[in-house]
Amino acid sequence: MNPNQKITTIGSICMVIGIVSLMLQIGNIISIWVSHSIQTGNQHQAEPCNQSIITYENNTWVNQTYVNISNTNFLTEKAVASVTLAGNSSLCPISGWAVYSKDNGIRIGSKGDVFVIREPFISCSHLECRTFFLTQGALLNDKHSNGTVKDRSPHRTLMSCPVGEAPSPYNSRFESVAWSASACHDGTSWLTIGISGPDNGAVAVLKYNGIITDTIKSWRNNIMRTQESECACVNGSCFTVMTDGPSNGQASYKIFRIEKGKVVKSAELNAPNYHYEECSCYPDAGEITCVCRDNWHGSNRPWVSFNQNLEYRIGYICSGVFGDNPRPNDGTGSCGPVSPKGAYGIKGFSFKYGNGVWIGRTKSTNSRSGFEMIWDPNGWTGTDSNFSVKQDIVAITDWSGYSGSFVQHPELTGLDCIRPCFWVELIRGRPKESTIWTSGSSISFCGVNSDTVGWSWPDGAELPFTIDK
């Protein structure tokens, strides 16, 4: 083979190898494209486990579930239409209280990022229950927690997180700027009511689905304030109670009917010699019952009951088992204010069952410590101090605080009645303990007609923290 033939042969072999290599590269590209095109989901968002996301779009809850199978994400959607929380059912018959949640916020906050809070409360939609709370714009064990014993400041905000979780920046949702608040769900969206501003001219901002829809101006220019617990919804309307005026004398009290975040009707109570603050309200058979705090001169609790047209009745719980704090020892009650130790008070609640009443109260008659539930079968109308059931919630040696009611509607539970529930705030820090801060955790219970147990579920945090030393 002469030199020219060698050159031609080598060139031909190189050309064949090049063509084969090019074909292999083209085949590899086609293979990658085909493999990518048959996958569904977003390959840039790898999910290590299943994840459910609930979004809200045009009055419809959209439940999106991402299922991770062999690095391939399949998106499934199930639309859950909004409902109207009717509130027409009666309260469920119950024999005791089953523990529902405990957030352990102070214990976790010694090392984790947990908000400094007060006035926590719980409210439920037809899909979920959430804990609402008033922050101080500060975290536990941080310098900004200093001086948070103060009730009203421009830094306080209403936020919420899933029930039973410690309130932190990572799981909490901003709701409103507020130093007094309420919230509830009508089956379509959350209504929030946040009061902020100066004592002599505060304004309540109403939001529906997170959007400002209305405002209410202080009408007596004397610390307008609201429930610090959930409002109550019946047939698409939500109802709340507000107070404006002295905390130690005759004040003014209004009930409001709110639809889709707008006030459609209000009524001022004609209630001389009554004092209503921080009402705990619930629906029962289409009407609203609120049990409140008398900070003026009653150691028993005042109540107001009204229908959807705001036609109302007023009274005091008659039982000789007194529900406020401070209070005298149990004795003979009154259907008006019981004066001994009637000054000051604490937010609380009761549930009416005919002539009977479940009374929640601190165990101590003088300090905010301990908690118990008492069934007085004649206590709504009778003045004796006889009761038939007592269930321990927090021991008298442990701190408690505010308490309030919430309900779970049949649309959530699947029952044919409204389940009564309550929460208890477990206050820690100032003014009773040697810290620079005041905060709290919470526990909650729901009524059941089955076995229950009395015990003590205290806050349990060991104080002081590092910041306090």
Curated annotation (Swiss-Prot):
Record GO cellular component, one term: membrane
InterPro entries recorded: Glyco_hydro_34 (IPR001860), Sialidase_Influenza_A/B (IPR033654), Sialidase_sf (IPR036278)
One annotated GO biological process: viral budding from plasma membrane
Keywords: Calcium, Disulfide bond, Glycoprotein, Glycosidase, Host cell membrane, Host membrane, Hydrolase, Membrane, Metal-binding, Signal-anchor, Transmembrane, Transmembrane helix, Virion
Enzyme class: hydrolase
Active-site residues, as the UniProt record annotates them: 151 (proton donor/acceptor), 402 (nucleophile)
Glycosylation sites: 50, 58, 63, 68, 88, 146, 235, 386
Intravirion topological domain: 1-12
Region (Hypervariable stalk region): 36-90
GO molecular function: exo-alpha-sialidase activity; metal ion binding
Origin superkingdom: Viruses
Binding site for substrate: 118, 152, 277-278, 293, 368
UniProt key word Hydrolase: yes
Region (Head of neuraminidase): 91-469
Nuclease found in the keyword field: no
Subunit field text: Homotetramer.
Note: The influenza A genome consist of 8 RNA segments. Genetic variation of hemagglutinin and/or neuraminidase genes results in the emergence of new influenza strains. The mechanism of variation can be the result of point mutations or the result of genetic reassortment between segments of two different strains.
Domain notes: Intact N-terminus is essential for virion morphogenesis. Possesses two apical sorting signals, one in the ectodomain, which is likely to be a glycan, and the other in the transmembrane domain. The transmembrane domain also plays a role in lipid raft association.
Name the UniProt record assigns to this protein: Neuraminidase
Originating organism: Influenza A virus (strain A/Hong Kong/212/2003 H5N1 genotype Z+)
Gene: NA
